[in-house]
Regions:
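N-terminal beta1-alpha1-beta2 submodule of the flavodoxin-like/Rossmannoid cofactor-binding fold
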Residues: 20-100, 111-113, 118, 122, ...
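Conserved N-terminal glycine/acidic-rich loop preference
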Residues: 136-142, 170-173, 177
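A short, structured loop/turn motif at beta-sheet edges
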Residues: 96-98, 123-129, 154
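Glycine-rich, N-terminal phosphate-binding loop of Rossmann-like dinucleotide-binding domains
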Residues: 106-107
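Surface-exposed, flexible loop/turn segments at secondary-structure boundaries
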Residues: 12, 35-37, 59-61, 139, ...
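Bacterial Sec-dependent N-terminal signal peptides
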Residues: 1-22
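Short, glycine-/small-residue-rich phosphate/pyrophosphate-handling segment
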Residues: 132-165
């Protein structure tokens, strides 16, 4: 009986230690936003967890015509059909070395992340990082996100995360940040 109790105590302490290690990691919230919904969530998440923040800025801003998914000739439709499309960024994250944990947010386009997110991952050394994905969406899920992003940062560990509402409370965002690491 003593062994069982000691084993349970040891397992509990190990679990608490792992959780404390995750909470002590330096976090960065990175996001791409066109309409402002993902920016709202990203800024609120960074505030809720005390993380730094970085916005992925496209070299050429997207217009409402660019985002018309019903038009097969719109910019976003063309980019999303081309697996090699990598829209240029207007900025770069100079150094990600100080961060262990990256919360990466974006709007869902065609059940996955916009191609500029791949551009960011390929331009930034993500080796050894844990990347927790989050998204905003008008109704689509995140079904293909890890699969489409992993090749752009093969030495990172991806966590699927979830779709978040721009109206998510600080408590909801803290809970998301905590449970996403499990």
């Amino acid at each position: 009986m003593k062994r069982i109790i000691l084993s349970l105590v040891a397992v509990t302490l190990i679990g608490l230690n792992l959780n404390a290690q995750n909470m002590n990691k330096k976090a960065l919230v990175v996001y791409f936003s066109v309409t402002g919904n993902t920016a709202t969530v990203a800024n609120n998440l960074a505030d809720a967890i005390g993380a730094d923040i970085f916005e992925i800025e496209p070299m050429q801003l997207y217009t409402s015509d660019d985002l018309d998914w019903t038009d097969e000739n719109s910019r976003s439709s063309i980019e999303m059909k081309d697996s090699k499309a990598r829209p240029e960024m207007n900025n770069n994250l100079d150094d990600a070395k100080e961060y262990d944990l990256i919360y990466l947010g974006f709007p869902i386009w065609w059940y996955t992340a916009p191609k500029i997110v791949n551009t960011f991952l390929e331009k930034t050394d993500m080796a050894g990082k844990t990347i927790v994905l989050f998204a905003t969406s008008g109704g689509s899920g995140m079904e293909n996100t890890v699969e489409s992003l992993k090749p752009s940062a093969p030495k990172a560990t991806f966590k699927r995360g979830k779709v978040l509402s721009k109206d998510a409370s600080q408590e909801e965002l803290k809970e998301f940040a905590k449970t996403a690491l499990k």
